[in-house]
Amino acid sequence: MNWSDLNLMPAMPEIVLLALLGVVLLADLWICDKNRYLTHLMSLGTVIIVAVTQLAVWEQGSVDAFHGMYIADGMSRLAKLVLYALTFGLFIYSKPYNQDRQIFKGEFYTLSLFALLGMSVMVSSAHFLTAYIGLELLSLSLYAMIALRRDSGRSAEAALKYFVLGALASGLLLYGISMVYGATGSLDFASVLASAFNEQANEWLLKLGMVFIVVAIAFKLGAVPFHMWVPDVYDGAPTSVAAFVGTAPKIAAVVFAFRILVTGMGTIHSDWAPMLAILAVASLVVGNLAAIMQTNIKRMLAYSTVSHMGFILLAFMAGAVGFTAGLYYAITYALMAAVSFGVLMVLSTRDIECENIKDLAGLNQRHAWFAFLMLLSMFSMAGIPPLMGFYAKFGVIMALLKQGHVWLSVFAVIMSLIGAFYYLRVVKVIYFDAPDHDQPVGSNYAAKFVLTVNAFLLLLWGIMPQTVIDWCAKALENTL
């Protein structure tokens, strides 16, 4: 085997990321705590260099590497650029928060970069083993990140719960993959699809394997009834880690699901679509109703995530138009969640952890700008125009209607109206309740600037949604 046969160029962003990650990891060993900002700067530089590398090797169409186990296409390129941007922003947001809690350490950055590498492999996988390796690299990094605050019993408990349930989901995924291999004789997505299309596969075994794989995907997305870990992780993990867990990995999981279900098992769409419909309906009901009862804003955002994943699963029911709407929704959700968690991190000081809804009381009187940014995020999540969240939900609902799923569309609208209640409750607390304290808000200018850009993208791309929708549609052109 020649190295040239591997065609490494499409995978150059991941290769550069791995190399620079090693540099950050080794350099951090020699950096003392008072100079830890150097690790922070090196990590930011790593993300920038990897993003530039991705743009430098950008090619039109689809290109594979590693003998067809890795693919660089429009969807993977767009997803990776969004992942890089989210990681960069979250590094900026989290710095003052981590410093106040003695977790401003190299482990946070190296584990985040390992997770980013895992996500990059996931979204570029063209083979079940590649997808599994990327997923496990992401999962193992997140387990450690959640337990990063060693003096917190809640963090340790959340990490242990996530680890146990994550190991179970990984086992189910492997079991499903083994059945797919037994049914088709291949683990390559294209070969599995061709085998099923040509009726050369063991249909019963393939469908049974598909059931296990859908369960594993539902766990990674946090869909009901496999959502048990989501509120515990969001609540127990440091807010900086919860922000990471709740944003970038969701985009990777959506693309991961697309790769497996559409490019690998598209011929049995009629079998997995009803399963996704049940998961979506359950997620919308449980997510929205449970969120209404929460007083802890991190747990509220966790159940909100569950309901948003329900919308994304509905998008898989609606064919090519639905896939575009689903990818757009995933990007929108990640941007909205990044703003929400970013504001919570900025409001959290050394003495106060902003984690209850009442902690936001009177925020408009204490810092009107952060109150406005939180308002943009909450309104967008509620689906109020002209913000991105409205067009994300509108796109999914219209895609469902075009496919004749009228009742699912009506149900989604009803759930959106119910969900708007708890988002508007947060806005009411921010603007109309009296503050419980006069604790000054942090004034990290870098975090404030990036957070402002993040929030205004929700408004800008809400006013001009077609820009991002076209990106998503073009990204999927050579993938479908």
Where are each of the predicted segments found?
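Alpha-helical transmembrane segments of multi-pass membrane proteins predominantly involved
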Residues: 1-480
